[in-house]
A protein has these predicted regions:
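P-loop (Walker A) phosphate-binding loop of NTP-binding proteins
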Residues: 9
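Walker A/P-loop
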Residues: 15
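ATP-dependent small-molecule kinase phosphotransfer cores
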Residues: 33-100
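Small-molecule kinase domains that catalyze NTP-dependent phosphoryl transfer to phosphate-bearing small molecules
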Residues: 91-92, 115, 135-185
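ATP-dependent NMP and nucleoside kinases share a basic, alpha-helical "lid"
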Residues: 93, 101-135
Length: 185
């Protein structure tokens, strides 16, 4: 199977690109959705979070307590990622099995380390991304700035870069061009 990861910073347009690729008939999987539907409520993950952070309440991960812990101990983010990423990737590969080509929308491309894949980076200027996040999530400028600061990772090396600061029609043309360069259409 050929796996192509779609990544980019918050508000960059990853979901828009992924939705368009799906509309073209390709298998597209959202790693956040996999985490939220398959991983976060699994007994082994809950036990691991309790062991690592002690942030389980009434048999579920207490997201607020976990966020507070990570805010106070940012070095523990790596432990959280080590607990979550292998589980998400296993579910992704299970779901994608049987497809010749599969796209995966990922927040953290490092989660796919050790798995052969291509990387498509969706970009947009910070001001454009902030507007999108505000419209989508109803967040204040201060909240958005804090979220951007937490996720201010360097842009990964990408096989394809798609600038989404354009009209919907132009973005579709850019994605089609990327699909052609990848010899998928």
């Amino acid at each position: 199977m050929r796996l192509i990861a779609i990544t980019g910073p918050m508000g960059s347009g990853k979901s828009t690109v992924a939705e368009y690729i799906a509309s073209r008939g390709f298998a597209v999987f959202d790693c956040d959705r996999i985490f939220n539907t398959c991983v976060i409520n699994s007994p082994d993950y809950i036990a691991e979070i309790e062991r690592l952070f002690g942030t389980v309440k009434d048999g579920k991960v207490d997201k607020k307590a976990l966020a507070a812990h990570l805010g106070a101990h940012p070095e523990d983010v790596a432990k959280l990622n080590a607990a979550a990423h292998p589980r998400v990737v296993a579910k992704l590969l299970e779901a994608a099995c049987g497809n010749d080509v599969a796209f995966a929308e990922v927040q953290v491309p490092e989660a796919l380390a050790g798995i052969e894949h291509e990387l498509w980076l969706v970009t947009a200027p910070a001001a454009v991304r902030a507007k999108r996040v505000a419209a989508r999530d109803g967040r204040s400028e201060e909240e958005i700035a804090a979220m951007f600061a937490l996720r201010n990772a360097q842009e990964p090396m990408a096989d394809e870069v798609i600038d989404s600061d354009c009209s919907p029609g132009e973005l579709r043309r850019k994605v089609d061009a990327a699909l052609r360069r990848a010899k998928l259409i």
